[in-house]
Amino acid sequence: MRGLGTCLATLAGLLLTAAGETFSGGCLFDEPYSTCGYSQSEGDDFNWEQVNTLTKPTSDPWMPSGSFMLVNASGRPEGQRAHLLLPQLKENDTHCIDFHYFVSSKSNSPPGLLNVYVKVNNGPLGNPIWNISGDPTRTWNRAELAISTFWPNFYQVIFEVITSGHQGYLAIDEVKVLGHPCTRTPHFLRIQNVEVNAGQFATFQCSAIGRTVAGDRLWLQGIDVRDAPLKEIKVTSSRRFIASFNVVNTTKRDAGKYRCMIRTEGGVGISNYAELVVKEPPVPIAPPQLASVGATYLWIQLNANSINGDGPIVAREVEYCTASGSWNDRQPVDSTSYKIGHLDPDTEYEISVLLTRPGEGGTGSPGPALRTRTKCADPMRGPRKLEVVEVKSRQITIRWEPFGYNVTRCHSYNLTVHYCYQVGGQEQVREEVSWDTENSHPQHTITNLSPYTNVSVKLILMNPEGRKESQELIVQTDEDLPGAVPTESIQGSTFEEKIFLQWREPTQTYGVITLYEITYKAVSSFDPEIDLSNQSGRVSKLGNETHFLFFGLYPGTTYSFTIRASTAKGFGPPATNQFTTKISAPSMPAYELETPLNQTDNTVTVMLKPAHSRGAPVSVYQIVVEEERPRRTKKTTEILKCYPVPIHFQNASLLNSQYYFAAEFPADSLQAAQPFTIGDNKTYNGYWNTPLLPYKSYRIYFQAASRANGETKIDCVQVATKGAATPKPVPEPEKQTDHTVKIAGVIAGILLFVIIFLGVVLVMKKRKLAKKRKETMSSTRQEMTVMVNSMDKSYAEQGTNCDEAFSFMDTHNLNGRSVSSPSSFTMKTNTLSTSVPNSYYPDETHTMASDTSSLVQSHTYKKREPADVPYQTGQLHPAIRVADLLQHITQMKCAEGYGFKEEYESFFEGQSAPWDSAKKDENRMKNRYGNIIAYDHSRVRLQTIEGDTNSDYINGNYIDGYHRPNHYIATQGPMQETIYDFWRMVWHENTASIIMVTNLVEVGRVKCCKYWPDDTEIYKDIKVTLIETELLAEYVIRTFAVEKRGVHEIREIRQFHFTGWPDHGVPYHATGLLGFVRQVKSKSPPSAGPLVVHCSAGAGRTGCFIVIDIMLDMAEREGVVDIYNCVRELRSRRVNMVQTEEQYVFIHDAILEACLCGDTSVPASQVRSLYYDMNKLDPQTNSSQIKEEFRTLNMVTPTLRVEDCSIALLPRNHEKNRCMDILPPDRCLPFLITIDGESSNYINAALMDSYKQPSAFIVTQHPLPNTVKDFWRLVLDYHCTSVVMLNDVDPAQLCPQYWPENGVHRHGPIQVEFVSADLEEDIISRIFRIYNAARPQDGYRMVQQFQFLGWPMYRDTPVSKRSFLKLIRQVDKWQEEYNGGEGRTVVHCLNGGGRSGTFCAISIVCEMLRHQRTVDVFHAVKTLRNNKPNMVDLLDQYKFCYEVALEYLNSG
């Protein structure tokens, strides 16, 4: 039977071959197997044998018959292998591999395992696709291989036998590659590669042609990966089905090659290999970066350029949640930055970025989280329901409705109890912090109050962002014991027996005074005989009475008065004072005018009796002799009752006195009555008791005097009289009077009176004149104000376009600050929209505008002969209103600036007037350029020298100013041979200002010769001495003293040298040039001669300066500008003024900036009042002037274009930028010089000018971990001596600590060595020594880092103005001490933006104050923003600049 089958099979094979339906690769093994391309593996344990029983019969019953390939397993150990390799096949058409196999065993146990492999494209062997290992059948069986690998793939079929250790045979025969599908095994169509994201199911769809029945096995076979089971079969027709396989929960290890397999009863079908690609969803490597913080928002940079996982990124999401909460939110993001809104204030959030790649499950896990906190928000409202709980005399207790976070909107807040009350007429304001805020019934007790005082109380809820107040509550404290009556207020008017006592109520009444209690007591007396025991008592007075009269007191007695005041609460402390009654005169005994005891012609003897004391003992007794004269009347006698003034007898005649003291003796010498003789010619206590004259009548008086407490009281009594014995007169020589002395005295008195009278009249007259002058000045000022206002009204009524122009100027010109200076006045002229006045200066008939201008501006210019009218405004190029200037320039710049190009090309180019003098051979060497020379009609003519007619030539032309003929001289930069002529011109023209708009050398070419000395230089007969040099960032001001031989005059001449014009083109911005123009205007004397303006040729830059200067005047006076006709007029005076179209456009931009920004400088004396006014809120616009100023600043800040930052945007530099939207422009980049391997020379930093030094600051971001090395290269390369750090170290924000705390850090060739550190308030200062190890010959540099701690991340401005000013001063001091101010300062914050800009701006403002005593915050910030637009990017930071300026002024 086997032979028959073999014959039939051979016949069928021949028929198929004849029919062309078989392919190479088949083999019947009739010939050697190698002829079929079969081979065996060299590394096998044994080989297959080719057997042909027809040629070599066998008697072994277990061996099959025929020709075939055989493996004899008998005697072979288990596990040995033998491989039979078919040739490689590359078949694209549907085909089938058919083969027969035979298995027999001598022990009924399988002799081994027969496997079939299909290896594709010389790839790995993989797992068997077919095998037979069952019981031996001892018959030939047929199997099919339906292989679908498809072109251009190729494959190789391999038969493998693995012995089992049992005896038997395994054979294969009749391997055929048929050109038609297998009949019993389905064929797979091509399966496709599958790409999935990790963690997802990978589904392979295997379409097959054929039938499948129950019992067929389908699976997905992988190479070096796990197999996948069948998911489902979908039969689509009787001859087609689709099998689905899932590789579940895929990981990177599941990636590889898979093919579909089906095992049927007739064989096996295999598909081509398909690739399973497993992509890892992307995850950011770094957390997002915080760009800015608000109360309800966080602005972040995604920072997702570096990822783990696979791209591409098709979606970005931001996931955020509170740090302590369980909820989270996720928002899609379509840009590199995102603002998370609707957040809670003062809440910590965790923010992560999720990235998504294509496909299901393509969203990666959240990246590292940024943990940050929102700012506090302004409290929602103030505390409510404030009420009084308890009132005492010195304290009150209040309570209020409790509140929580929803009201405070900040976890860090203060509840301040603000209260005020009056004490002693002064308002006392106090604040206390209440800590009882968490209680359900919060209350606060205010202590140390004054009793019976109205206390105004309110609660202030404050957090870092704002404050809200409660309603005010007024409560009166309870009464208390009053204070003491002021001791100094207790005043007593003393009499001999009375004291009138007065006092004031207590300073601290502490209630209503209802009663005063006065206790008095005698404490001492001058009279020791007085009994004081009964001299005391108590008196009460009502509260409205503060005086009392005490009478019945003893003279000369000291009384103590004690006063207490009482309120309803009781008496307060006592106040005591003492007063002494006045002493009384002694009481003289009674004397009758009795006959004296004895009397002679020259004496009288009387009886003297002791007097009685009253309040003070008698001190002395005196005898007074009074001469009776006929003219003496009784009235006179009554007036001179006693004699307080002692007069010696010797002086009585000289003083023309009627009396004299004859004797004085102490009181203790007269204890009892005793006689005394008047005229006994003796001396008593210095008084001569001279004998009486017989011919005169006398009255004899006895008086007693008591002296105590600085007063003297006298009483006297007449004790005797003596009549004249003989009335005949006797001459008295001693009574002769010097009449000359008396007359002289009278005359002197009269003269003194006259002098005093005249002085009084003169003073009164002077005061009257001063008052009249003041009234006159006030009247004059009022008249001037009315005049100017009426002029404004008259022009406004005419409805001209100037009103709109000045409306624009008022809106945008910051000169509206009410800074009083002459230039702040603006004059309006009556102009039409199509024309401007005929000339820049008036003719003789032009009166009102010029006269008024002269009045307001107070300028006087040197009178010159009128020149030709400068120009007539053309109809095609009318003047432009200032209000329309922005729109005009925008239109002109359309279509690549076609409007400007057309206008500029319409100017006449080249010579337009004769220049014969300049062309003379004698003058050719005086011209720097042959085509820029002086026209004859407008050239400056010098005085000839020694008859040389050509010596009057200099290459310079007169140019008319605005309403000022020949106001400028445009000239070339002096050459070596024309320096003397230049100074001759300056002297001859009485010039006070020279404007130089070039550098001496540019691009290696000499543009101008240095025509000024560094000390003193003599140019023939002119001596020039340099007095002062003032260096500023963009210009230099030099002051010279100039003398001319033979002229006794020294002139002060200033040279304004603008150094900021670049070598090519025009300045990038006009800010510096506009400031330069204003300096020239402010420092040029109005009475001096023309301004001499020169560059190199005296045409291009010179023309720019002159046009800008003229147009600024025109814009201010008329509200219009006429740049086109101004340039045209300039060109009629000097060839090719404004040489390039670029310069022409720059002039327009400069004028626009000047009109928008205005002059914003403020004198130091006016800063405080101005800043106060700037912060006032306009109720109509709900805005303030400072907000408008900041808005204007934002409007004029230039926007960086992509081409401006081309270097920062290079792919190799991306990773060096913290934020891709905060980049330095190419023009101010500091390129790194120190070589460090292959590292680039780029760093995210920008050079910034200070007030006096160009490129004094380098503003940069906080170094990233990968740019720390570049940071120190920057410090070393650019000679930086200070580093200012305005942010915190925060590794989460990629802000590492970039300096060593001790020892040495090495960053490539640069070594940074720690030297010292110091902490002072909010500033940590560290000193480092840095050097380049690769260039030891360069030495080292000391660098001080100033880390400012007073600017928390959540605040827009520093906490303290004083601390920040101290930081500025410390940096300035270090810079000046270490390097003489020549070193640069590196300033950095997180991103090199707002904080760094604030530091630089304030530093500039402080320099302004130090050198110019002016403040110009707008100009300082505008200058910084010209290079980096994000400098000082918040209104609060802008205000802070003003506030630190005020702090600077306050600190002196």
Curated annotation (Swiss-Prot):
This is Receptor-type tyrosine-protein phosphatase mu. It is a single-pass type I membrane protein. Residues 284-379, 382-480, 482-587, 589-671 form the Fibronectin type-III domain. Substrate binds at residues 1063, 1095-1101, 1139. The gene is PTPRM. Residues 21-742 are extracellular. Residues 186-277 form the Ig-like C2-type domain. Pfam families: fn3 (PF00041), Fn3_PTPRU (PF23144), ig (PF00047), MAM (PF00629), Y_phosphatase (PF00102). Changing residue 299 to A: Abolishes dimerization. The chain crosses the membrane at residues 743-764.
